[in-house]
Amino acid sequence: MEASISFLGSTKPNISLFNPSSNVLPRRDFPLPALKLKKVSVLPRILHQKRLIRAQCSDGFKPEEDDGFVLEDVPHLTKFLPDLPSYPNPLKESQAYAIVKRTFVSSEDVVAQNIVVQKGSKRGVHFRRAGPRERVYFRSDEVKACIVTCGGLCPGINTVIREIVCGLNNMYGVNNILGIQGGYRGFYSKNTMNLTPKVVNDIHKRGGTFLQTSRGGHDTAKIVDNIQDRGINQVYIIGGGGTQKGAEKIYEEVERRGLQVAVSGIPKTIDNDIAVIDKSFGFDTAVEEAQRAINAAHVEVESVENGVGIVKLMGRYSGFIAMIATLANRDVDCCLIPESPFFLEGKGGLFEFIEERLKENRHMVIVIAEGAGQDYVAQSMRASETKDASGNRLLLDVGLWLTQQIKDHFTNVRKMMINMKYIDPTYMIRAIPSNASDNVYCTLLAQSAVHGAMAGYSGFTVGPVNSRHAYIPISQVTEVTNTVKLTDRMWARLLASTNQPSFLTGEGALQNVIDMETQEKIDNMKISSI
């Protein structure tokens, strides 16, 4: 038996008894005493959520003895189709799984979000473990699946496509699989192709996406109309935060219409800015490819007098690629990311640090994420904010701007001869095939998505949480952007490696500290804080 505690915009929750085997909504409600919520005025997007928190417990549930176990569960088709029949999983007859000690994942298997705990800590948030279930809710010969890719390119997309097709076919005997071409627009423009293991056999060796992609174009009603008209009952959506929000809307419309359609998201972002999961696919490949650009910049600046090389890497709001590429390379003197505001002039500023390094080494390399310093650039260029078709802010070229600022300062103010080298490998990094590590990772993501859809789960995304693959509600990965936390040890390791200034003593430092404190409050907001 489970008890579900519901916080629906009120400080006085209700508790309901819930039978996990029935997959239906709670039926008996009785009020709990009013609880005092920890007030955090900076969290409007969290406090407005109408989240259902399920605390697993014994039959004799006592709220005061709650150990803080929270299951962030994913929807199941039986939630709105209670009479949906189930069938034995075809993997029972699979030779591949014949010698596996434990073929099927138990409904009680969960993955903990936080594995570093102290004595007396609450058990915290958990997610359902990914993997095959003993019962499935689709007959193999009745499955009509489709796959769509949306948003920007990323190494590994083709591997995910290939492994979804091969997973459905080889593990579950599914033969009817469609590829939706050109992103979400492909649903209602009817651009499709049939996918078989033979068709996708070697696409993992190519960069880009075999199905083509686009930004924007999401029209929920048109998309679900097309899904319904075609008789599609499994939808696999590969894309970033905006794409996953679209996937959630598709699931909600499918549920509203009462359709037996499983909607599965596979998170994709080269920036590694997806929340909850350990990392996004393609990230390792991007970091590895970035080394070539950094090495080239280092060779260039070593070969001239007072050489300063700038390498601009991807990272709209999150500086993970720049940070990890810098740590991996060891030839970088300074790393600038969106999360850490910097300033140019004055004591402790970037210009002062550059001059010190040039006097010491006669050259230096700067790695900057594309989203860093955007306020400075916009102010300098007097540019207004514009957005792309996905609603993302169009970034100004901070690399070119910084190159010119450094050149002007040292030429006109310091009267120093300086040789600037600027490298922008953005499209080179994201357009390549995935490396061996990402290929394996993409395979696990694809197979986890297939197992989840066949088991009747819907409105979920997949990914590793503390190295264990889990099913995660889509809302969990779209509510917050994963960013580099300046209070974590990883950023401290980078500062120790480059010996660069922290930029906490100059203009914008106060706001930077406030932002860090706000992030800590978000991280610390657990079930134990209410």
Swiss-Prot record:
It comes from the Eukaryota. ATP binds at G152, R215, G216, G240, G241, G242, T243. It is found in: Plastid, Chloroplast. One of its GO terms (biological process) is fructose 6-phosphate metabolic process. Pfam families: PFK (PF00365). The modification Phosphoserine is found at S121. One of its GO terms (cellular component) is chloroplast. The keyword Acyltransferase does not apply. Catalyzes the phosphorylation of D-fructose 6-phosphate to fructose 1,6-bisphosphate by ATP, the first committing step of glycolysis. Homotetramer. This is ATP-dependent 6-phosphofructokinase 4, chloroplastic. It comes from Arabidopsis thaliana (Mouse-ear cress). The gene is PFK4.
